Amino acid sequence: MANIKQQKKRNKTNEKRRLRNISFKSATKTIVKQVKIAVEQADKAKALANLSLAYQKLDKGASKKIYHANFVNRNKANLQKLVNTILS
């Protein structure tokens, strides 16, 4: 347990940030899963719409340092490859 006053404050803010990040990651995973489901069902319109949302969420996560930039780029590339299978 922290004895220093500032560290106690930091622990509070770190916990708030951790909970916010968990929520954000969960929402991102849900959208990515929706893209994969749309591809399995060969629903082009739904896949493209969800792909756009997934890109937005991943980019936002990278800018807020929730995700590493390489992780985001890799996921975006893999999702695009997946969607391209039903587009062609």
UniProtKB/Swiss-Prot annotation:
GO biological process, one term: translation
GO terms under cellular component: cytosol; small ribosomal subunit
Database matches in InterPro entries: Ribosomal_bS20, Ribosomal_bS20_sf
Keywords linked to the UniProt accession: Ribonucleoprotein, Ribosomal protein, RNA-binding, rRNA-binding
GO molecular function: small ribosomal subunit rRNA binding; structural constituent of ribosome
Region (Disordered) residue spans: 1-20
Function: Binds directly to 16S ribosomal RNA.
Family of this protein: Belongs to the bacterial ribosomal protein bS20 family.
Protein name, per record: Small ribosomal subunit protein bS20
Source organism of the structure: Phytoplasma australiense
